[in-house]
Amino acid sequence: MEHYISLFVKSVFIENMALSFFLGMCTFLAVSKKVSTAFGLGIAVIVVLGISVPVNQLVYTHILKDGALIEGVDLSFLNFITFIGVIAALVQILEMFLDKFVPSLYEALGIFLPLITVNCAIFGGVSFMVQREYNFPESVVYGIGAGTGWMLAIVALAGLTEKMKYADVPAGLRGLGITFITVGLMALGFMSFSGIQL
């Protein structure tokens, strides 16, 4: 149990997808204007990462890995296309669910919901799972932890962005300029966790 807790904490704080690896920055910067929208997208990323990482772990272990299907047959060259297909299918299911049951969040996310399919944080989570050779329970914990870390970062940035609306930001830094500086300072803050050994 201790191993899974340390893996979760490590994936949320030490190896944060957005602030340590800078993955998923397109939606991270675009949807960080309001806390409510950022929170909704963060939940969607947790769901997609929490399901796609373990599902892709099963697909990789039982089908794509060298000798998994048939002895001597290596299908690992199909990793990228298979992983993207699984992620796209999960995002489509999530999109239909939100459209049916939470239409306000579906409208608020707009074009960024389908963009989760090509969000490099999602694919990065799956790639790290393969690279680090996580088993199924580890991939579940890692997927949920990585999604939680990404959500924590985007909600924090959205909160800071909402506060900066009332600040006297110099004209040359308004918009993306101050956002990049803020993200850089947040990344420096999260870098302080890198010395922790779990």
From Swiss-Prot:
GO BP terms in the entry: respiratory electron transport chain; sodium ion transport
Q: Answer whether the UniProt record assigns the keyword Membrane to this protein.
A: yes
The protein's location, in the record's own words, is: Cell inner membrane
Q: What is its main location?
A: membrane
Gene Ontology MF, one = oxidoreductase activity, acting on NAD(P)H, quinone or similar compound as acceptor
How is it placed in the membrane, per its record?
Multi-pass membrane protein
Write the Enzyme Commission number(s) for this entry: 7.2.1.1
Q: Which reaction does it catalyse?
A: a ubiquinone + n Na(+)(in) + NADH + H(+) = a ubiquinol + n Na(+)(out) + NAD(+)
Q: Where, by residue number, does the polypeptide cross the bilayer?
A: 11-31, 35-55, 77-97, 110-130, 140-160, 176-196
Instruction: State the UniProt keywords alphabetically.
Output: Cell inner membrane, Cell membrane, Ion transport, Membrane, NAD, Sodium, Sodium transport, Translocase, Transmembrane, Transmembrane helix, Transport, Ubiquinone
- GO cellular component, as recorded: Gram-negative-bacterium-type cell wall; plasma membrane
**Origin, by domain of life?**
Bacteria
> Which PANTHER family does this entry report, sorted A to Z?
INTEGRAL MEMBRANE PROTEIN OF SOXR-REDUCING COMPLEX, NA(+)-TRANSLOCATING NADH-QUINONE REDUCTASE SUBUNIT E
Q: How does it assemble?
A: Composed of six subunits; NqrA, NqrB, NqrC, NqrD, NqrE and NqrF.
The record's HAMAP family line, in alphabetical order, gives: NqrE
Task: Please state what the protein is called.
Answer: Na(+)-translocating NADH-quinone reductase subunit E
In its UniProt entry, the species of origin is given as: Mannheimia succiniciproducens (strain KCTC 0769BP / MBEL55E)
This protein's gene is called nqrE
